[in-house]
A protein has these predicted regions:
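Nucleotide and nucleotide-moiety/phosphate-recognizing core
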Residues: 1-148, 156-172, 179-180, 184-189
Length: 190
């Protein structure tokens, strides 16, 4: 695959986390820095979709949502609208265990015909760890304008590819949404 841009969706204050999710500390550093570390071997072309200045300490391009308060689809719309590459790695900011190896697998298995490629286990699809084509910008705009913001509904409207992984491989894809989940993660890793 030609050059890729990685966009990390820094969605703002989480009601369950009580703070900016990407800046929550895990093993001594913010989630966002764990994600950057996983992305850098893949591409140095990293941008953040964020409406806050809290990420300004990191030397990457930041972009505010073009259409506010539209959840992950709004962030993906902003990313793809601003992207200069056809294919883009879209990641949420709450996946501190993501690895370069898994991202490389996603890219290696991506079929160029698919406009979205994501991982899935038997029990769960991971739409916010994926490769998204710039070609779907107008379709995203359409669903945003209609306030159809559910990621799974959107996925069903687009030619997409699911890369199956075993439940046992699911752990690095875990997204951390609450203090309890963070505590569980710390316990599981200790």
């Amino acid at each position: 695959m030609e050059t890729l841009t990685a966009f990390i969706l820094c969605g703002g204050k989480s009601s369950r986390m009580k703070s900016e999710k990407g800046l929550v500390l895990f093993q001594g550093k913010p989630f966002i820095e764990h994600i950057i570390q996983a992305v850098l071997p893949i591409t140095g072309n990293i941008e953040f979709i964020t409406n806050t200045k809290e990420y300004d300490y990191l030397p990457y391009q930041k972009r505010a949502d073009i259409v506010k308060d539209k959840g992950p689809l709004g962030g993906i719309y902003t990313a793809l609208t601003n992207s200069e590459t056809e294919f883009n790695l879209i990641l949420s900011c709450d996946i501190p265990l993501i690895s370069s190896e898994l991202l490389a697998e996603l890219i290696a298995k991506h079929n160029q015909e698919a406009q979205i490629t994501v991982f899935a286990t038997e029990s769960r699809i991971h739409p916010l760890i994926g490769i998204y084509s710039k070609k779907i910008v107008s379709l995203i705009r359409e669903v945003i304008d209609n306030n159809e913001l559910k990621m799974m509904d959107f996925l069903s409207k687009v030619p997409h590819q699911i890369i199956k992984i075993e439940e046992s491989e699911n752990f690095p894809l875990t997204n951390i949404n609450s203090v309890d989940e963070l505590n569980d993660l710390n316990i599981n890793l200790s």
